[in-house]
């Protein structure tokens, strides 16, 4: 029996083939619809906002009146946010930028009362070797990603940084949208589609916990999700069980199975940048160089000048004659 963890989500690029404001219009429409689904269908259990928190800021600048409702559903674990502020391109920003990204994401998650403690990295163009070390610095011991994994690695393995820090990694073998447009036109076809996706994963899985990623770029939640999961569980011929799940629930089940069955996971040390299974897109290292130069100048001035010198005001405050006596 396989456990199919259906993860309803979207992958959100704030600007890409459309402008930021055009994509924000879509984002507002998406979250408005999500709130309607959550209001009206108690069986629609979870939706993940791509591991980012900046989308909440973008939405609330237009729909501030929905803050309380968003906060409620986040605290109820029906909307999952974080741990990132924004999904990083790991090779194009400084190490400190990556750390601050997680730190700001943590602060925003605390404001809403819930934080997804998974290193979710669905689409960065390959991965730095120190990422497990950075994640463990924020008490995150699991990660899920797609690109850069060499052929032959299973869906679950251990990723290790050069300093020895390790995380349990879920390899999104067929990407972050292996059931992106599920459910389909009929309940029967939806059953067959989910069964096909499970059989594809079976060839590469070393556990019985399968990630079924129901989402892709800028896609909205599907209102028939809960009904389609019920139909699948009642009629599938293989005895598999589908559940409307979350990444934390998936990793809890995965960790328990690894422990119960004494599964020995392969270990990968360092960078994940193999191009054979998924495009590395190395052209991003040199495209629009003026943007990269300005970004590097801004982050360097913040890291090396503005922030270090700003602390001197606090030091000097303590040098007043009565304070130092």
Report the location of each language-model feature.
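Catalytic-domain carbohydrate-binding cleft regions of carbohydrate-active enzymes
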Residues: 1-325
């Amino acid at each position: 029996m396989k456990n199919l963890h259906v993860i309803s989500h979207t992958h959100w690029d704030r600007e890409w083939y459309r402008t930021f404001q055009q994509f924000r219009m879509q984002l507002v429409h998406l979250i408005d619809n999500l709130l309607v689904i959550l209001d009206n269908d108690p069986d629609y259990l979870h939706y993940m906002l791509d591991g980012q928190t900046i989308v909440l800021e973008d939405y609330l600048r237009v729909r501030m009146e929905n803050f309380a409702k968003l906060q409620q559903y986040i605290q109820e674990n029906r909307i999952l946010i974080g741990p990132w502020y924004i999904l990083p391109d790991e090779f194009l920003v400084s190490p400190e930028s990556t750390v601050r990204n997680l730190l700001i994401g943590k602060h925003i998650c605390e404001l809403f009362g819930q934080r997804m403690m998974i290193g979710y990295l669905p689409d960065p163009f390959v991965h730095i070797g120190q990422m497990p070390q950075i994640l463990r610095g924020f008490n995150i011991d699991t990660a899920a990603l797609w690109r850069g994994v060499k052929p032959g690695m299973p869906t679950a393995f251990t990723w290790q940084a050069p300093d020895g820090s390790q995380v349990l990694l879920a390899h999104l073998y067929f990407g972050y949208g292996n059931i992106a447009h599920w459910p389909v036109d009929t309940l029967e076809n939806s059953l067959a589609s989910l069964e096909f996706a499970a059989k594809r994963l079976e060839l590469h899985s070393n556990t019985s916990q399968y990630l079924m990623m129901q989402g892709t770029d800028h896609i909205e939640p599907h209102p028939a999700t809960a009904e389609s999961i019920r139909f699948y569980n009642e009629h599938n011929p293989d005895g598999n069980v589908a559940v409307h799940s979350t990444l934390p629930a998936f990793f809890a089940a995965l960790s328990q199975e690894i422990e119960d069955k004494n599964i020995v996971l392969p270990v990968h040390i360092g960078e994940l940048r193999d191009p054979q299974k998924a495009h590395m897109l190395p052209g991003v290292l040199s495209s629009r160089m003026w943007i990269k130069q300005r970004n590097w100048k801004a982050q360097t001035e913040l890291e090396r000048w503005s922030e270090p010198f700003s602390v001197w005001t606090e030091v000097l405050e303590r040098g007043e004659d009565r304070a130092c006596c």
